[in-house]
Structures are given as C-alpha cells and as structure tokens.
Amino acid sequence: MFSYNKERSLRIWELAALLALSISLCAGAWAEARQSSISSRLIRLHVIAASDETQEQEIKLRVRDAVLEYLAPRLDGATDAEAARELIAANTDGIAKAAESAAEGRTVRVTLGRERYPTRRYDGFALPAGEYESLRVILGEGEG
C-alpha cells in the first residue's frame, strides 16, 4: 500500500509539473503574439541624446517635441503603420531639419529600421518588450 501511494503521489507531481510547463508555454506564446500584434501597428520614436548629462537630456526632449510637431500634420492621413512608414521615409530630410532646429548645434542622424526595446510604461498603458519599427534620431555621438 505504501508503494501505491508513493507512485500515485509521484504521478500527481509529474502531472502538476506538466501542467505548469504547458501554462508557461501558452503564456509565453500569448505574450509573443500580443507583442507582435502591437509592434506591427506602430512605429516608435527613439531620440538618443549626445550624453547622459542633464543638459543633453533636456535637448533630447526638445528634439523629441520638434520631431513630433513636424510629423503630426504629415501623419494625420496615415491609415495604418505601413502608410505612416512610407510618409516617415519620404520625410527623413524634414525630420532631420526639425531635429536640428532644436539640437543646439549637435549633429543629427535620422534612421528608420527595426530595434529591440525593453518594456516601457507610459501614463495609462505599457508597450511590451520586443522588436519594433523605430524612427531613431541620434544626437551627436548618441551616447545618452
């Protein structure tokens, strides 16, 4: 009788471990599908400061605001991420000029491509970690 209970107990543990593994795999697949769904519908703006110094971080925020102000009317008619991507690609020179106007003499490089991001929390929502289409505006050496 002791052997029967021991075997049954071991079997229950095996089933519990299998169930936990299955739940983990499903949760991971769901999270990946969710991130993929979100990332296919948006383009992230990543302004990289020249350094971590306070003044450089303030300039970065002014550049961000200038780029968003430049892009807002141009992206107003975009119906999806692909249309937005095309509009951004067609306006990289204008984006660079808008950034330069706020960059206080720092060099500016503008690129559009894919980039990995950590989870980022904003007021009222969060974007999961993953790979996103990204408009990058790099100031100076981009070490900030």
Which ranges hold each PLM region?
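Generic secondary-structure boundary/loop-capping signal
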Residues: 39, 44-45, 119-122
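Mid-length scaffold segments of soluble, non-membrane domains
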Residues: 81-144
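Aromatic-capped interface at the extracytoplasmic side
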Residues: 26-40
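Early exported N-terminus immediately downstream of N-terminal targeting peptides
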Residues: 41-92
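Hydrophobic membrane-insertion alpha-helices, especially the h-region
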Residues: 13-29
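N-terminal Lys/Arg-rich, disordered targeting/topogenic segments
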Residues: 1-9
